[in-house]
Amino acid sequence: DYIAFITSEGEVAVYQGTDPSDATKWSLVGVFKIARPIGKRCIVNVGPELIVITESGFVPLTQMYAENESNYSKAISDKISGSILTAVTNFKSTFGWEALIYPKGQFGLFNVPNGVSGEFVQFVVNLSTGAWGRFTGQDAYCWGLLNGDLYFGGNTKVYKADNGLSDAGVQIQGNAKTAFVYYGGRGTSKRFTAIRPIVSSDADLPVSIGFDVDFNDGTSTYTPSSATTTGSEWDNTAWDSGLWAGTISSQLVWRSVADIGWNAAIRIKTSSQAQSIKWHSVDIYYEKGVGL
Protein backbone atom coordinates (compact mmCIF):
# COMPACT_ATOMS: atom_id res chain seq x y z
CA ASP A 1 0.00 0.00 0.00
CA TYR A 2 1.06 3.58 -0.68
CA ILE A 3 0.08 6.84 0.95
CA ALA A 4 0.88 10.34 -0.30
CA PHE A 5 1.07 13.47 1.82
CA ILE A 6 0.68 16.72 -0.15
CA THR A 7 1.36 20.13 1.36
CA SER A 8 -0.23 23.42 0.34
CA GLU A 9 3.04 24.31 -1.43
CA GLY A 10 3.00 21.20 -3.62
CA GLU A 11 5.54 19.13 -1.71
CA VAL A 12 4.70 15.42 -1.92
CA ALA A 13 5.99 12.64 0.32
CA VAL A 14 5.09 9.07 -0.62
CA TYR A 15 5.33 6.18 1.85
CA GLN A 16 4.83 2.45 1.38
CA GLY A 17 3.72 -0.09 3.96
CA THR A 18 0.97 -1.19 6.30
CA ASP A 19 2.12 -0.16 9.79
CA PRO A 20 3.77 3.25 10.43
CA SER A 21 4.76 2.13 13.94
CA ASP A 22 6.93 -0.70 12.57
CA ALA A 23 10.03 0.37 10.63
CA THR A 24 10.12 -2.99 8.85
CA LYS A 25 6.61 -2.43 7.49
CA TRP A 26 6.84 1.26 6.65
CA SER A 27 9.30 3.11 4.42
CA LEU A 28 9.73 6.35 2.50
CA VAL A 29 9.41 5.88 -1.26
CA GLY A 30 10.31 9.40 -2.31
CA VAL A 31 9.81 13.13 -1.98
CA PHE A 32 9.10 15.38 -4.96
CA LYS A 33 7.38 18.61 -5.87
CA ILE A 34 4.37 19.48 -8.01
CA ALA A 35 2.57 22.75 -8.65
CA ARG A 36 0.61 23.98 -5.65
CA PRO A 37 -2.73 22.20 -5.18
CA ILE A 38 -5.98 24.18 -5.22
CA GLY A 39 -8.63 23.73 -2.54
CA LYS A 40 -9.15 21.01 0.05
CA ARG A 41 -10.99 18.63 -2.33
CA CYS A 42 -8.28 18.58 -4.96
CA ILE A 43 -7.58 14.83 -5.20
CA VAL A 44 -9.47 12.05 -6.96
CA ASN A 45 -8.66 8.38 -7.58
CA VAL A 46 -8.79 7.15 -11.18
CA GLY A 47 -8.00 3.46 -10.98
CA PRO A 48 -4.49 3.17 -9.56
CA GLU A 49 -3.76 6.83 -10.33
CA LEU A 50 -4.22 9.96 -8.23
CA ILE A 51 -5.23 13.12 -10.08
CA VAL A 52 -4.50 16.41 -8.31
CA ILE A 53 -6.00 19.81 -9.14
CA THR A 54 -3.00 22.17 -9.21
CA GLU A 55 -2.09 25.63 -10.42
CA SER A 56 -0.65 24.06 -13.59
CA GLY A 57 -3.66 21.87 -14.34
CA PHE A 58 -5.01 18.46 -13.40
CA VAL A 59 -1.91 16.32 -12.95
CA PRO A 60 -1.42 12.54 -12.47
CA LEU A 61 0.72 12.06 -9.39
CA THR A 62 2.68 8.99 -10.53
CA GLN A 63 3.74 10.63 -13.80
CA MET A 64 4.77 13.81 -12.02
CA TYR A 65 6.88 11.69 -9.68
CA ALA A 66 8.70 10.29 -12.71
CA GLU A 67 9.09 13.74 -14.29
CA ASN A 68 9.07 17.14 -12.58
CA GLU A 69 6.65 19.98 -11.90
CA SER A 70 7.74 21.95 -14.97
CA ASN A 71 6.48 19.28 -17.39
CA TYR A 72 2.97 20.70 -17.80
CA SER A 73 2.27 18.48 -20.82
CA LYS A 74 1.81 15.57 -18.40
CA ALA A 75 -1.36 17.20 -17.07
CA ILE A 76 -4.48 15.39 -18.28
CA SER A 77 -5.96 18.87 -18.79
CA ASP A 78 -3.23 19.85 -21.28
CA LYS A 79 -5.76 20.12 -24.15
CA ILE A 80 -7.81 22.69 -22.21
CA SER A 81 -4.88 24.34 -20.45
CA GLY A 82 -5.91 27.82 -21.59
CA SER A 83 -9.30 27.59 -19.88
CA ILE A 84 -7.87 26.01 -16.75
CA LEU A 85 -5.04 28.50 -16.32
CA THR A 86 -7.49 31.39 -16.81
CA ALA A 87 -9.68 29.99 -14.03
CA VAL A 88 -6.63 29.48 -11.81
CA THR A 89 -5.50 33.06 -12.36
CA ASN A 90 -8.91 34.54 -11.58
CA PHE A 91 -10.47 32.20 -9.03
CA LYS A 92 -7.88 29.94 -7.40
CA SER A 93 -8.81 31.29 -3.95
CA THR A 94 -12.56 30.84 -4.52
CA PHE A 95 -14.32 27.95 -2.80
CA GLY A 96 -15.64 25.10 -4.92
CA TRP A 97 -12.71 23.43 -6.70
CA GLU A 98 -13.41 19.70 -6.66
CA ALA A 99 -12.81 16.51 -8.65
CA LEU A 100 -15.08 13.47 -8.89
CA ILE A 101 -15.30 10.30 -10.98
CA TYR A 102 -18.80 9.35 -12.18
CA PRO A 103 -18.67 5.67 -13.25
CA LYS A 104 -22.26 5.51 -14.54
CA GLY A 105 -21.63 8.43 -16.88
CA GLN A 106 -18.11 7.26 -17.74
CA PHE A 107 -16.64 10.69 -17.12
CA GLY A 108 -14.48 12.57 -14.68
CA LEU A 109 -15.85 15.90 -13.47
CA PHE A 110 -13.83 18.89 -12.31
CA ASN A 111 -15.85 21.63 -10.62
CA VAL A 112 -14.29 25.05 -11.27
CA PRO A 113 -15.40 28.49 -10.03
CA ASN A 114 -16.41 30.89 -12.77
CA GLY A 115 -16.99 33.94 -10.56
CA VAL A 116 -16.89 35.04 -6.95
CA SER A 117 -20.64 34.90 -6.25
CA GLY A 118 -21.47 31.22 -6.69
CA GLU A 119 -20.96 30.79 -10.44
CA PHE A 120 -19.37 27.51 -11.54
CA VAL A 121 -18.59 25.44 -14.63
CA GLN A 122 -17.65 21.79 -14.86
CA PHE A 123 -14.87 20.53 -17.10
CA VAL A 124 -15.69 16.94 -17.98
CA VAL A 125 -13.38 14.30 -19.46
CA ASN A 126 -14.59 11.14 -21.19
CA LEU A 127 -12.86 8.27 -19.40
CA SER A 128 -12.83 6.13 -22.56
CA THR A 129 -11.60 8.63 -25.16
CA GLY A 130 -9.96 11.41 -23.14
CA ALA A 131 -12.13 14.01 -24.91
CA TRP A 132 -13.07 17.12 -22.95
CA GLY A 133 -16.33 19.02 -22.65
CA ARG A 134 -17.80 21.70 -20.42
CA PHE A 135 -21.08 21.89 -18.48
CA THR A 136 -22.63 25.26 -17.71
CA GLY A 137 -25.74 26.28 -15.79
CA GLN A 138 -24.98 23.98 -12.84
CA ASP A 139 -23.77 26.30 -10.07
CA ALA A 140 -22.53 23.56 -7.76
CA TYR A 141 -20.63 24.13 -4.54
CA CYS A 142 -20.06 20.39 -4.12
CA TRP A 143 -20.66 17.04 -5.82
CA GLY A 144 -21.37 13.52 -4.61
CA LEU A 145 -22.63 10.06 -5.52
CA LEU A 146 -25.54 8.20 -3.93
CA ASN A 147 -26.32 4.68 -5.11
CA GLY A 148 -24.26 5.45 -8.20
CA ASP A 149 -26.30 8.53 -9.12
CA LEU A 150 -24.79 12.01 -9.42
CA TYR A 151 -25.89 14.91 -7.20
CA PHE A 152 -24.67 18.43 -6.55
CA GLY A 153 -25.27 21.01 -3.87
CA GLY A 154 -26.42 24.40 -5.10
CA ASN A 155 -27.52 27.49 -3.22
CA THR A 156 -29.71 25.98 -0.42
CA LYS A 157 -30.77 23.06 -2.64
CA VAL A 158 -29.56 19.60 -3.66
CA TYR A 159 -30.03 18.64 -7.32
CA LYS A 160 -29.88 15.30 -9.10
CA ALA A 161 -27.64 15.67 -12.13
CA ASP A 162 -27.49 13.64 -15.35
CA ASN A 163 -31.17 12.84 -15.00
CA GLY A 164 -34.05 13.46 -17.39
CA LEU A 165 -34.16 15.34 -20.68
CA SER A 166 -34.58 18.91 -19.44
CA ASP A 167 -32.66 21.33 -17.25
CA ALA A 168 -34.95 21.76 -14.23
CA GLY A 169 -37.88 22.11 -16.61
CA VAL A 170 -36.23 24.33 -19.21
CA GLN A 171 -34.41 23.53 -22.44
CA ILE A 172 -30.94 22.04 -22.45
CA GLN A 173 -28.59 24.10 -24.62
CA GLY A 174 -25.84 22.24 -26.47
CA ASN A 175 -22.87 23.81 -28.24
CA ALA A 176 -20.10 21.63 -29.66
CA LYS A 177 -16.99 22.42 -31.67
CA THR A 178 -14.38 20.10 -33.15
CA ALA A 179 -10.66 20.66 -32.91
CA PHE A 180 -9.04 22.56 -35.79
CA VAL A 181 -7.80 19.96 -38.27
CA TYR A 182 -5.26 20.46 -41.07
CA TYR A 183 -7.22 18.51 -43.69
CA GLY A 184 -4.86 17.15 -46.32
CA GLY A 185 -1.79 18.21 -44.33
CA ARG A 186 -0.21 21.42 -43.06
CA GLY A 187 1.69 22.38 -46.19
CA THR A 188 -1.06 24.04 -48.25
CA SER A 189 -4.19 26.09 -47.82
CA LYS A 190 -7.59 24.67 -48.79
CA ARG A 191 -10.85 25.91 -50.20
CA PHE A 192 -13.67 24.36 -48.20
CA THR A 193 -16.92 23.92 -50.12
CA ALA A 194 -19.31 21.65 -48.19
CA ILE A 195 -19.77 19.92 -44.85
CA ARG A 196 -22.08 17.16 -43.65
CA PRO A 197 -22.42 16.60 -39.91
CA ILE A 198 -24.05 13.22 -39.24
CA VAL A 199 -26.67 13.89 -36.56
CA SER A 200 -29.56 11.77 -35.28
CA SER A 201 -32.43 12.48 -32.91
CA ASP A 202 -35.64 10.93 -31.66
CA ALA A 203 -37.70 14.07 -32.42
CA ASP A 204 -37.75 17.23 -34.53
CA LEU A 205 -34.95 19.47 -33.27
CA PRO A 206 -33.27 22.68 -34.40
CA VAL A 207 -29.64 22.17 -35.38
CA SER A 208 -27.51 25.13 -36.42
CA ILE A 209 -24.10 24.74 -37.99
CA GLY A 210 -21.04 26.96 -37.97
CA PHE A 211 -17.69 26.70 -39.74
CA ASP A 212 -14.39 28.28 -38.65
CA VAL A 213 -10.95 28.38 -40.26
CA ASP A 214 -7.43 29.20 -39.05
CA PHE A 215 -8.23 29.15 -35.33
CA ASN A 216 -10.88 31.85 -35.61
CA ASP A 217 -13.92 31.54 -33.39
CA GLY A 218 -17.48 32.47 -34.23
CA THR A 219 -17.04 33.39 -37.89
CA SER A 220 -20.75 32.65 -38.34
CA THR A 221 -23.52 33.47 -35.89
CA TYR A 222 -26.68 31.56 -35.19
CA THR A 223 -29.56 31.38 -32.73
CA PRO A 224 -31.32 28.00 -32.47
CA SER A 225 -35.08 27.93 -32.04
CA SER A 226 -37.06 25.45 -30.00
CA ALA A 227 -39.70 25.14 -32.73
CA THR A 228 -40.10 21.82 -34.48
CA THR A 229 -39.82 21.64 -38.24
CA THR A 230 -40.27 19.31 -41.14
CA GLY A 231 -36.73 20.07 -42.21
CA SER A 232 -35.07 22.22 -44.83
CA GLU A 233 -33.04 21.29 -47.89
CA TRP A 234 -29.49 22.55 -48.11
CA ASP A 235 -30.04 24.69 -51.20
CA ASN A 236 -33.24 26.37 -49.98
CA THR A 237 -32.17 27.88 -46.65
CA ALA A 238 -29.14 29.60 -45.19
CA TRP A 239 -26.61 26.94 -44.26
CA ASP A 240 -26.01 28.36 -40.79
CA SER A 241 -29.65 28.77 -39.77
CA GLY A 242 -31.60 25.87 -41.27
CA LEU A 243 -33.56 23.59 -38.94
CA TRP A 244 -33.20 19.85 -39.31
CA ALA A 245 -36.00 17.38 -38.76
CA GLY A 246 -34.88 14.86 -36.18
CA THR A 247 -35.80 11.20 -36.55
CA ILE A 248 -34.54 7.95 -35.17
CA SER A 249 -32.30 7.75 -38.25
CA SER A 250 -29.34 9.97 -39.01
CA GLN A 251 -29.58 13.20 -40.98
CA LEU A 252 -27.34 13.06 -44.06
CA VAL A 253 -27.67 16.58 -45.46
CA TRP A 254 -24.77 18.40 -47.15
CA ARG A 255 -24.36 22.11 -46.34
CA SER A 256 -22.44 24.49 -48.58
CA VAL A 257 -19.62 26.60 -47.13
CA ALA A 258 -17.21 29.03 -48.75
CA ASP A 259 -14.02 29.53 -46.78
CA ILE A 260 -10.29 29.38 -47.45
CA GLY A 261 -7.83 28.44 -44.74
CA TRP A 262 -5.10 26.13 -43.56
CA ASN A 263 -7.27 24.32 -41.02
CA ALA A 264 -10.94 24.15 -40.10
CA ALA A 265 -13.35 23.33 -37.29
CA ILE A 266 -17.08 22.62 -37.34
CA ARG A 267 -19.57 23.89 -34.77
CA ILE A 268 -23.03 22.58 -33.94
CA LYS A 269 -25.57 24.26 -31.68
CA THR A 270 -28.96 22.96 -30.58
CA SER A 271 -31.54 23.13 -27.82
CA SER A 272 -33.84 20.38 -26.62
CA GLN A 273 -36.40 19.48 -24.01
CA ALA A 274 -37.66 15.90 -23.66
CA GLN A 275 -35.60 14.84 -26.69
CA SER A 276 -32.16 13.38 -27.23
CA ILE A 277 -29.63 14.09 -29.96
CA LYS A 278 -26.33 12.54 -31.06
CA TRP A 279 -23.54 13.89 -33.24
CA HIS A 280 -21.79 10.91 -34.80
CA SER A 281 -19.29 12.29 -37.31
CA VAL A 282 -18.71 14.92 -39.99
CA ASP A 283 -17.77 14.76 -43.68
CA ILE A 284 -16.10 17.66 -45.47
CA TYR A 285 -15.30 18.63 -49.08
CA TYR A 286 -12.25 20.76 -49.82
CA GLU A 287 -9.76 21.55 -52.59
CA LYS A 288 -6.06 21.80 -51.85
CA GLY A 289 -4.21 24.89 -52.97
CA VAL A 290 -1.02 24.86 -55.02
CA GLY A 291 2.17 26.57 -53.86
CA LEU A 292 1.94 29.62 -51.60
Task: Annotate each predicted stretch with a short phrase.
Residues 2-3, 41:
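Beta-propeller and closely related beta-sheet repeat lectin domains
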Residues 4-32:
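Surface-exposed extracellular loop regions of Gram-negative outer-membrane beta-barrel proteins
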Residues 7-8, 16, 54, 110-112:
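Short, structured patches in soluble enzyme cores that scaffold and shape functional sites
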